[in-house]
């Protein structure tokens, strides 16, 4: 479900930072959306980080934006030029 109000990426980013989900209007029927993964701190206890840091090392996991894909998987997301300039971003509720 979405609000139907369209906006640019600057507003979309502010909505993401406020904890809301956003999508491009064309993605909506596919169940895709972006969301913020907040930063956290954890101790290394398994690969692949266990091959980089000694076990028990405290690591800072930085906040970032992930995408729920049409297949239901979660992937890191990076904006394209067309995403940055688009004016068809919408809030996703639920």
Identify the meaning behind each predicted range.
Residues 12-14, 43, 55, 60, ...:
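Intrinsically disordered, low-complexity, compositionally biased regions/tails
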Residues 41-44, 53-55, 83-87:
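Short, low-complexity, polar/charged sequence segments that are solvent-exposed and flexible
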Residues 59-94:
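Short, compact, well-ordered microdomains
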